[in-house]
């Protein structure tokens, strides 16, 4: 049992003398029950066990709300069709979507497939394109040739041998990414990760998506309501109605009256109307670790309709932050994420315009405030937060949507049978998400701590006080052994595997002093995988179409259904 679950009883009671009674074995050796609930606790426990969870109410739409609705509804389709379970989403007609164009993680492919979405339809209706990773330019020194890839493919033979020490022993000037995977070369060439004959959701090279968040949410809404039986209510929530124990009983809306539920999912964005507002769960700020607190977003048209379209996100370092550059079929989504403590808004806009070039003329950027961090608790009473209501981190590694997916899947799979067991599931959910958010913060910070850039923003990121202790310990360890499974990366809760850390570390010039301890068999195996990566690179460069060509063919002909 985890430390956070110890002593937790249903309905939030803890094992204090008021509600738990324990007796020792007496002289007569008659064994009593280990504990018993007090009369009030027993009453609440029985009430909880008699209250099944049948009605899930999601407050808030957008990607978080509709993706969560889809995952839960797909998982419980049998009950929805039998009319013993319902998913209702309440969405304000007056609140705009925050999304500025999204990068995603490969998990979205399996998520969309499981809820029954056609990949062809995704491309046709969401201005979607392929994403094979991220290119980080200027993060180490700022020199013209300073760039590395964090691809979405694992190194060849990743589950059998760690190629990092063998690359370190004799890289011959070849980057780690190019030595162990073909994906950096595919991105350099602007190639797609599959062919038109590759079935939906299948891959030649691992991939995620770039997509328009403003189109993605309505696309999910249509699918959820027409195919999965999700009830859609367009209304503004005016009042949150709570029971004596703090549970939310219902919400009162302006247009649709009172809507009751057994489990409420807070997808109300930064304001966190239910978890942060009604239940008062505090926000845990991490701006002392991740300094960027503002973004300027700009949608940039292509010079020509058939202009090359990058199959990777481009993250370019600047004086006080970094720009994102996402290629969609009809435009580029760009923006500058920066620290307002290190640069003014006007100076940041000037840097963004210099990066975009002449195409920025006449375009007005949209300013977005960023508060990096998360709620201290993600699930309290009968309320669980997903998406921005749970927290937000700068979009450096496309973690926003994958966190929505993982939370939605966990809620769907662990859906409480009744209120009596909900607190047990909530404790598990909180443990998993505390770990995930902490590790993502570590991974994002890793991108900043190996820099040699001279600007104050970058130098401030090297302050040990801003580097989490776990990351400091791992950096010390990695001086002598490369990241691998035994650095806790075998946990199911991990979002970024050991390979992701390798790509960033060695892409930024980190050196590991590896002792030559591998036997001949391991060296032979590693040499074979490195040679395999080289041959695969040659073959795929000759076979795969360009990113834009494949997206156009998908629009014209569609992908083959599985």
List each model region and its residues.
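Predominantly flavin-linked oxidoreductase catalytic cores and closely associated redox partners
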Residues: 201-321, 327-335, 339-348, 408
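Glycine-rich FAD pyrophosphate-binding loop
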Residues: 74-100
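Short FAD-binding loop at a beta-strand-to-alpha-helix junction that anchors the flavin cofactor
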Residues: 378-396
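Long, low-complexity C-terminal extensions of enzymes
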Residues: 413-562
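Low-acidity, Ser/Thr- and Arg-rich intrinsically disordered low-complexity segments
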Residues: 2-4, 11, 15-19, 28
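N-terminal Rossmann-like FAD-binding beta1-loop-alpha1 element of flavoenzymes
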Residues: 54-83
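Conserved FAD/dinucleotide-binding core of flavoprotein oxidoreductases
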Residues: 317-369, 391-402, 414, 422
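Dinucleotide-binding Rossmann-like beta1-alpha1 core, especially the glycine-rich loop
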Residues: 96-187
């Amino acid at each position: 049992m985890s430390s956070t679950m110890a002593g937790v009883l249903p309905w939030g009671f803890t094992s204090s003398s008021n509600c738990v009674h324990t007796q020792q074995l007496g002289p007569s050796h008659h064994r009593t029950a280990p504990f018993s609930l007090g009369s009030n606790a027993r009453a609440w426990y029985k009430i909880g066990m008699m209250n099944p969870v049948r009605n899930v109410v999601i407050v808030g739409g957008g990607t978080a709300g509709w993706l969560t609705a889809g995952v839960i509804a797909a998982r419980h389709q049998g009950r929805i069709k039998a009319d013993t379970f319902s998913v209702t989403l309440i969405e304000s007609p007056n609140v705009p979507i925050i999304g500025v164009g999204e990068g995603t993680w490969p998990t979205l492919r399996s998520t969309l497939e499981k809820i029954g979405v056609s990949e062809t339809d995704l491309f046709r209706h969401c201005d979607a394109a392929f994403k094979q990773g991220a290119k980080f330019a200027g993060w180490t020194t700022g020199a013209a040739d300073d760039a590395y890839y964090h691809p979405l493919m694992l190194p060849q033979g990743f589950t059998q041998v760690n190629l990092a020490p063998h690359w370190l022993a004799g890289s011959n000037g070849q980057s780690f990414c190019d030595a162990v995977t073909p994906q950096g070369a595919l991105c350099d060439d602007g190639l797609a990760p599959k062919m038109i004959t590759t079935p939906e959701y299948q891959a030649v090279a691992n991939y995620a998506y770039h997509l328009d968040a403003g189109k993605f949410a309505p696309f999910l809404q249509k699918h959820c309501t027409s195919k999965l039986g999700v009830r859609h209510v367009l209304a503004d929530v005016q009042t949150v109605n709570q029971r004596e124990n703090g549970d939310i009983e219902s919400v009162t809306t302006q247009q649709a009256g009172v809507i009751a539920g057994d489990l409420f999912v807070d997808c109300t964005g930064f304001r966190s109307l239910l978890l942060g507002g009604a239940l008062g769960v505090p926000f845990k700020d991490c701006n002392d670790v991740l300094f960027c607190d503002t973004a300027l977003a700009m949608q940039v048209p292509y010079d020509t309709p058939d202009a090359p379209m990058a199959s990777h996100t481009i993250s370019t370092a600047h004086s006080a932050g970094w720009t994102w550059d996402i290629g969609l079929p009809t435009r580029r989504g760009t923006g500058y994420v920066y620290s307002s403590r290190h640069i003014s808004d006007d100076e940041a806009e000037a840097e963004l315009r210099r990066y975009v070039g002449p195409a920025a003329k006449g375009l007005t950027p949209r300013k977005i405030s960023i508060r990096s961090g998360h709620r201290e608790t993600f699930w309290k009473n009968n309320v669980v937060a997903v998406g921005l209501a749970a927290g937000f981190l700068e979009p450096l590694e496309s973690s926003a949507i994958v966190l929505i997916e993982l939370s939605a899947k966990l809620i769907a799979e662990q859906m409480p049978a009744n209120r009596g067991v909900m607190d047990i599931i909530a404790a598990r959910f909180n443990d998993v998400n505390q770990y995930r958010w902490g590790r993502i913060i570590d991974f994002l910070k890793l991108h900043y701590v190996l820099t040699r850039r001279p600007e104050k923003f970058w130098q401030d990121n090297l302050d040990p006080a801003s580097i989490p202790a776990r990351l400091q310990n791992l950096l010390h360890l990695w001086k002598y052994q490369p990241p691998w499974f035994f650095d806790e990366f075998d946990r199911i809760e991990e979002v970024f595997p050991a390979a992701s850390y390798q790509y960033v570390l060695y892409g930024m010039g980190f050196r590991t002093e590896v002792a030559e301890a591998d036997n001949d068999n391991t060296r032979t195996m590693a040499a074979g995988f490195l040679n395999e990566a080289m041959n695969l690179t040659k073959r795929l460069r000759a076979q795969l179409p360009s990113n834009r060509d494949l997206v156009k063919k998908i629009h014209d002909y569609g992908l083959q259904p599985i």
